Amino acid sequence: MLLVSTVSAVPGLFSPPSSPSNSSQEELLDDRDPLLVRAELALLSTIFVAVALSNGLVLGALIRRGRRGRWAPMHVFISHLCLADLAVALFQVLPQLAWDATDRFHGPDALCRAVKYLQMVGMYASSYMILAMTLDRHRAICRPMLAYRHGGGARWNRPVLVAWAFSLLLSLPQLFIFAQRDVGNGSGVFDCWARFAEPWGLRAYVTWIALMVFVAPALGIAACQVLIFREIHASLVPGPSERAGRRRRGRRTGSPSEGAHVSAAMAKTVRMTLVIVIVYVLCWAPFFLVQLWAAWDPEAPLERPPFVLLMLLASLNSCTNPWIYASFSSSVSSELRSLLCCAQRHTTHSLGPQDESCATASSSLMKDTPS
């Protein structure tokens, strides 16, 4: 479950713990704790179902809504975030589930490299899509004249393309670091492991991944959200010159209802800001802390159950992403309720008031303003 492995030390990205290279043939067999293996499989299965189901539902709701009109900019980002998280489920969690079940990677060298590459693509894409979405919200609020200059409502806009391009590019080292290698000095037992030219290569690479996948996006997201909050706060609290102008005119600019609407919008933005940053840090921090610990400390408890289970939580953020943005988007949450309502109708094969409620929900969404 470590990010990378050498043939003499630690297991590979999301691979089960393996024996060191000087082990005998008997020791290279699967001697893992059966209870721990079952716990790993149960945890990975739960994460896979949660990621696939939640992102599939939200993506289905967005596609259903998009068929009836132009895609809103926020919906474009949420849909690509769902795609990135589905890539995490299919190319990261599912291979790890099979890997944990068999203890060794069973497949050719090309498949080993492809799996490792796609695992990292999913991690980068999920983080960078959130960062791209936050940058777009910052531009829309703080630089509104530039918000839609580059095709904000298109299904593929510039921030989305940049996020995918960086994810594909930064994952390329995986193709050269990992390969099917003998884990026991001629034992004939092979696993998908990494090899570095220098002893410090493992520490440098794990630290680089932690910075690029977790630290840098987290700082960027937090900075953008602070700037968004400051911009909204500045629009609500007039400066000295604006207050003087209002006194000279002898009247207020704007109605109480308009001010209340802006205050509600700011409160919603602040809540979303806190949720995004806190959940992002809480989901990624345990995983990368144990990764860095394992890379920098030769005495790290690699096979202790808490340590092993924490290494499986790289995809935890993909479980929460769709629900965070769906809950703060009235149009997405309404479409999701309508989709679930109609799915229940088809499941029960019932006609009558339930059909009418589905139709009413769908028609009302046509007038819903994207948020």
Curated annotation (Swiss-Prot):
One of its GO terms (biological process) is negative regulation of cell population proliferation. A lipid is attached at residues 341-342 (S-palmitoyl cysteine). Its main location: membrane. GO terms for cellular component: endocytic vesicle; endosome; perinuclear region of cytoplasm; plasma membrane. The keyword Cytoplasm does not apply. Residues 357-371 have a biased composition (Polar residues). This is Vasopressin V2 receptor. The chain crosses the membrane at residues 39-63, 78-98, 114-135, 160-180, 201-220, 272-293, 309-328. It is a multi-pass membrane protein. It comes from the Eukaryota. Residues 240-260, 349-371 are annotated as: Disordered. CDD domains: 7tmA_V2R (cd15388). Keywords: Cell membrane, G-protein coupled receptor, Glycoprotein, Lipoprotein, Membrane, Palmitate, Receptor, Transducer, Transmembrane, Transmembrane helix. One of its GO terms (molecular function) is vasopressin receptor activity. Glycans are attached at residues 22, 185.
